[in-house]
Amino acid sequence: MTQDAKKALLGMLGLCRRSGNLICGSELVCAELSAKEPPLLVIVAADASNATVDKMTKKCFHDQVECSVVPLDTGELGHAIGKTGAIASVGVKDKNFAKRIGELANILKGTN
């Protein structure tokens, strides 16, 4: 089930990116968290630096946005959304994508 959830999560992130509802990169996500319409969900790769994970979780907690550190590496996350480099975090702006991606992230983490 975990491999299926991982594949589904990566696919949903790619679809979300193509629909224009995904913010890519930690700096952009942090900036958007303070915006008028912040992302509804933030996904952070498990191999992101400790500083990045800490920064994202604290900022999300402060702004009351769900944050999920998932067992994906930055390369997988970047590849799934069509980026050539490593991406440590993404923000989901659409409520329907956020709901499904959040469910898949919880399954992947084993906390469904």
State the predicted function of each range.
Residues 37-57, 65:
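N-terminal positively charged helical leader segments and presequences
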